[in-house]
Structure formats: C-alpha cells, structure tokens
Amino acid sequence: MARNVLYPLYQLGGPQLRVFRTNFFIQLVRPGTAQPEDTVQFRIPMEMTRVDLRNYLEQIYNVPVAAVRTRVQHGSNRRRDHKNVRIKKPDYKVAYVQLAHGQTFTFPDLFPEKEPTSPDPLEEELPQQRQSSDPRCPGIPSWFGL
C-alpha cells in the first residue's frame, strides 16, 4: 500500500526519481512472556497482512523471515470519562515473526543497571550541617527557622 504518487513527465534518459514509502508503521515490542530466541514480536496496523509484514521486513530491512503469525488484541474499555461512559482504546494487531534458520534476536537492554558509585562528599556533610546550629544566631534552636 503506497501513497498516491505523481510521477514526473518523461524526460529523455530520465532518471529514476520514484521512491517507495509505505503507509505502515510497525513497532518492535518487548514480549510480556518468554519467547524463543528466533521469534520477534511487533505491533502492526489492523490493515497490514502477514504477506505485507513479510515483504516489509525482507525488502526494506533485509531480514530473512521463516513464518509470520498474527492475532488481534482487543483494546481495553475499563476507563470511564466524566459522564461515566466507557472509553475504549482501539484494537491493534500483534505479529509474531519467526526468523529464518540460524537467525536470533535478543531485545536490547536500553537501561542497564548502574553500579553504585561512591557517595559524594557534599552529601555526607549535609546531615552534619543540618544538625549543627547556625553560627550567626547563637542560642536559638534549629527548629526556629529564619
């Protein structure tokens, strides 16, 4: 499925100015349950078919695909508006793509765990400063703020 494209008029020795762009946007989704290493989960538009997804991945991204399975996920309708009317989220299609033999995919770890660093010396002095009295106002308790 492509946008309506207006092709330029023919020119002698005419260069190829046509660029194919799809109307589909697919999202790579981290699976909720454990999947085999050769299976990748996508969220795709309702209009997209298995054949469209296979061609999309093979032609644009050069990803070899063995099989494509799809299912329709119904949108939640638990939310209610100010008039107590249910608000339904739109349905979407989930595709499970099995990669060709020998291909594996592991979801990237975007936010790795950081190693605990040594505490900042200023953070260590802060509780001590709070406990000490203000030298500008001797004899006044610390709870009596300025």
Swiss-Prot record:
Cited InterPro entries:
Nucleotide-bd_a/b_plait_sf, Ribosomal_uL23-like, Ribosomal_uL23/eL15/eS24_sf
Q: Which GO terms describe its biological process?
A: mitochondrial translation
What keywords does the record list, in alphabetical order? Answer: Mitochondrion, Ribonucleoprotein, Ribosomal protein
Q: Where in the cell is it found?
A: Mitochondrion
- What one GO molecular function would you report for this record? structural constituent of ribosome
Q: Which family does it belong to?
A: Belongs to the universal ribosomal protein uL23 family.
Q: How does it assemble?
A: Component of the mitochondrial ribosome large subunit (39S) which comprises a 16S rRNA and about 50 distinct proteins.
Instruction: State the name under which the record lists this protein.
Output: Large ribosomal subunit protein uL23m
Organism of origin is Rattus norvegicus
Q: What is the lineage of its organism?
A: Eukaryota, Metazoa, Chordata, Craniata, Vertebrata
Per UniProt, what is the name of the gene that codes for the protein in this document? Mrpl23
